[in-house]
Amino acid sequence: AIYLGNEYPSVINSINIGNETLVFWSDHRVPVDTLSSYLKYVKNNVSLPVTTADDFNAWNREENKKIADLVDFIVLHVHPLWAGLQIEGSVDWTRKIYNEIKDIHKDKLIVIGETGWATQKHNQGLQAKLIKGKTGEVEQEQFILGFKKWADTKNIPYFLFEVFDENWKGGDHPNEVEKHWGLFKADRTPKLYMKNYKSHYEQN
């Protein structure tokens, strides 16, 4: 990352160190002091902004303030579907969480690094307990349109999660929710939001 950042600064605009390494439910947690040392090392060796990406339930914890102070900007993951929201309240909840994190870290740029809506889920396991909202292409389109209307109006930088379905993710069952967050299917055929993208753009 250091080499690439220094070699291609006109192409790479920032460097992210670690993904969901602080949040309590992560299966690959990294101690704050360890992550801090990684961030400092990279910051000392590049001129690009440096950050780490994590769930809102990491950025709202006092024990992670050291990391928030160290990064150049915050990358926030906020998934209303995983939080048990129905589609009708999903954008309001996302806005609420963003504002809460912004209130905690007033002097930081906050980039929403992950948000979206899955198009399938399995009816067994943890996802069956946590996910209450209906999944599907109609619901995904509805969430993205509502989210973008808010985020674009407020000039909030964001990444939609995600471009393509990833069939290798999660468990073996084909309906496993982790496989189905893409705006396109794994074979690159578009889902409903992307099928209608031109009409959405022309209307706005």
Residue spans for each PLM region:
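Active-site groove signature of glycoside hydrolases
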Residues: 2-30, 62, 112
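Aromatic-lined carbohydrate-recognition surfaces of secreted/lumenal glycan-active proteins
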Residues: 40-61, 107-118, 156-168
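Surface-exposed amphipathic alpha-helices with a cationic face
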Residues: 2, 31, 35-47, 51, ...
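Extracytoplasmic/secreted cell-surface and envelope-processing proteins
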Residues: 23-28, 32, 59-62, 83-86, ...
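Catalytic-core region of carbohydrate-active enzymes that cleave or remodel glycosidic bonds
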Residues: 94-112, 125-156
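Distinct, well-ordered alpha-helical segments
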Residues: 1-5, 28-33, 38, 55-71
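Aromatic- and acid-rich polysaccharide-binding/catalytic face
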Residues: 12-19, 54-96, 117-118
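Aromatic-rich peripheral "rim/lid" segments of glycoside hydrolase catalytic domains that contact
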Residues: 123, 127-137, 150-204
